[in-house]
Amino acid sequence: MKNTTTPKKRRKTILWILGICIVAMAMVVGVCNRKVNKCAEGRMYQNVSEIPYRRVGLVLGTTPKNAKGNPNLYYRYRMKAAAQLYHAGKVSYLIVSGDNHKREYNEPECMRQSLIALGVPDSVIYSDFAGFRTFDSMVRCKEVFGQDSVTVISQRWHNQRAVYIAQHKGLDAIAYNANDVDMKWWYVKSRTREMLAKVKVVLDVAFGKQPKFLGEPVAVGR
């Protein structure tokens, strides 16, 4: 039997299928982002004076310098926010959680030194060297560092994801929003990445994802 499908019809069919896939993916991204953002409502704070006291603050890690070797403003603002909370008496201890998968790359130690330079005593800072992802940092805060409640410290969009994870892992979390970075080109890039990260975290929670490492319990402030 002769195939009557023309190249034009095939292209049209392919475009329809691609269009449906794009719409479906956009819907998934939208639903997941609304779900995460909704979960964080009422738990985000901008002003030090308004945020309730929590014994422990969890500082989420990032690289101190960007790909060009320049200071990373996301990092700088997070350190400043964490120090503000400590000096205002809003937290008594800080867990600095980040990536240390290579000896020469140590986010927690960099954060510790930055906080000490901002006047935070070394004795109140605890390092989580296996905070490879936000998911790992939040779960380890409860399972390894023994916390039932915590103040998360990062930028607003990052905090939303962290609070969502906490709420689904039995950790009562509020968040203090560090200043964001006002660079339009970077804003678009980081927000696009964050939208996709929120989809991933919804799937991680739904499918019972576990951190890469747990380990022995660490007592904070004892």
Task: Locate predicted features.
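A transmembrane-helix-recognition feature enriched in membrane-embedded lipid enzymes
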Residues: 188-213
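N-terminal type II signal-anchor transmembrane helix
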Residues: 2-49
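Short alpha-helical segments used as structural interaction elements across diverse proteins
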Residues: 5-9, 13, 75, 158, ...
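A structural signal for short, hydrophobic/glycine-enriched beta-strand patches
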Residues: 34-191
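A general structural signal for short secondary-structure boundary/capping elements
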Residues: 101-106, 174-177, 196-204, 219-222
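The feature marks non-catalytic terminal segments
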Residues: 210-222
